[in-house]
């Protein structure tokens, strides 16, 4: 005959397995709602412009080379092959001031920015002696700026030269589909002092702004009103300052660090913008309640297990029996906490939603247990204990770097409490089936383990 303790533990483990079903459904709901938010970001990007990645400015020198080849009949055929030579700047300085605004669509929101980017660029005198051949025709060079999304171009000033040059749409290079270019002349490039130019590009975008540091020496300065930037990328800023009013950051890099010049060393280089290193600043939400809710749900099974353990100890130490249905109802209330948290966080923010959900579920469980455990004080103690656990969970969620330390300390404290309460308990007596069927003499109370002994 199996002991009572065996069947009790087996039942509790079975109930915890059952609770895995709504927990899995909760994770699915969180993924679904997070997907809705991402679709909103996509809709805003489609109606304005997406994340911007700026490549340039650089100078492109097109030239046509005539090659004589024999065809199948042995006749000489002249083929004209189009080539491009790329000239990278000696120095590149960009000063940007994007202003961020929050755009809402329903209950979701995303960040869009718009602001000027002031470019100052210097090119050295190029070596073009190898193009002075009879079979080579050099075309008109042009200055090129490539973008991820040309819809974000709000305005562009003329290229600052002794004689200003207006920009034209398009890149003129097949591998770079979106951008602008300004026509130049070979005489401009062959000056001993090189080519110095400046211009201002007013650009709009969403989510992030990146600049590929093409110059032998490159520098980017950004100043914005968004107080929650993310600088993760190929290069961290050398200087940064983040306040409640916004942020400022400065990046510097050279060819020694980024080796970008090697990507343009040969003519007709295939330019893959996404693979080139870049200075990047992203606009992030101060609190991602979907991510926090997902992390909270990962602790759900632990919370349910701790609550069931508390019930089990209460049964063992007091002799008052708790039915498995009562375990199941309390477990359902614990799972409902996370659904309430997710639903309210979309409207009230994570902190207020967490407070409301924890008070509501703790109060509901406390009210129910005051009847199930035959004592208002017992129900209040369980509710207070749950509130304490929810408080610890909130600290775990807010302090991701210290979550492991806090979690280990919590588990140690719980284990120590269990060992302290059960240090004098005779588990063989608890496991004895006769303990539930023996009769107690009239007028004599059944001996029980007392917490205060």
Would you name each region that the model predicts?
Residues 35, 39, 46, 60, ...:
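Soluble non-transmembrane domains of integral membrane proteins
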């Amino acid at each position: 005959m199996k002991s009572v303790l065996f069947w009790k533990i087996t039942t509790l483990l079975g109930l915890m397995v059952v609770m895995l079903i709504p927990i899995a459904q909760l994770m699915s709901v969180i993924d679904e709602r997070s997907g809705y938010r991402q679709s909103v970001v996509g809709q805003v990007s489609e109606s304005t412009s997406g994340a911007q990645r700026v490549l340039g400015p650089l100078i492109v020198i097109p030239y046509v080379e005539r090659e004589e080849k024999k065809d199948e009949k042995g006749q000489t055929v002249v083929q004209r092959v189009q080539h491009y030579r790329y000239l990278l700047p000696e120095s590149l300085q960009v000063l940007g001031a994007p202003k961020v605004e929050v755009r809402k669509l329903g209950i979701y929101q995303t960040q869009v920015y718009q602001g000027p980017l002031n470019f100052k660029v210097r090119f050295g005198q190029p070596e073009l002696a190898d193009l002075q051949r009879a079979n080579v025709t050099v075309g008109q060079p042009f200055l090129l700026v490539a973008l991820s999304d040309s819809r974000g171009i709000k305005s562009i000033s003329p290229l600052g030269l002794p004689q200003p040059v207006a920009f034209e749409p398009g890149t003129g290079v097949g591998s770079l589909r979106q951008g602008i270019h300004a026509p130049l002349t070979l005489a401009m490039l062959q000056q001993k002092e090189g080519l110095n130019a400046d211009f201002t590009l007013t650009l709009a975008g969403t989510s992030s702004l990146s600049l590929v540091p093409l110059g032998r020496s490159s520098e980017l300065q950004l100043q914005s009103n968004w107080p929650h930037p993310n600088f993760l990328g190929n290069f961290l800023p050398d200087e940064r300052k983040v306040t409640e009013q916004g942020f400022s950051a400065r990046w510097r890099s050279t060819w020694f660090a980024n080796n970008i010049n090697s990507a343009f060393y040969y003519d007709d280089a295939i330019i893959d913008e996404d693979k080139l290193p870049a200075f990047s600043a992203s606009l992030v939400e101060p609190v991602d309640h979907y991510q926090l809710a997902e992390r909270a749900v990962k602790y759900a099974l632990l919370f349910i297990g701790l609550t069931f353990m508390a019930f089990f100890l209460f049964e063992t130490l007091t002799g008052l029996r708790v039915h498995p249905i009562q375990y199941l109802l309390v477990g359902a209330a614990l799972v409902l906490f996370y659904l309430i948290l997710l639903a309210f966080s979309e409207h009230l923010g994570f902190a207020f939603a967490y407070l409301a959900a924890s008070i509501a579920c703790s109060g509901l469980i406390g009210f129910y247990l005051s009847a199930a455990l035959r004592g208002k004080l017992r129900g209040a103690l369980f509710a207070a204990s749950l509130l304490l656990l929810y408080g610890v969970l909130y600290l775990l969620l807010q302090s991701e770097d210290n979550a492991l330390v806090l979690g280990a300390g919590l588990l140690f404290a719980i284990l120590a409490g269990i060992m302290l309460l059960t240090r004098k308990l005779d588990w063989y007596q608890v496991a004895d089936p006769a303990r539930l069927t023996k009769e107690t003499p009239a007028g004599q109370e059944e001996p029980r383990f007392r917490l205060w002994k």
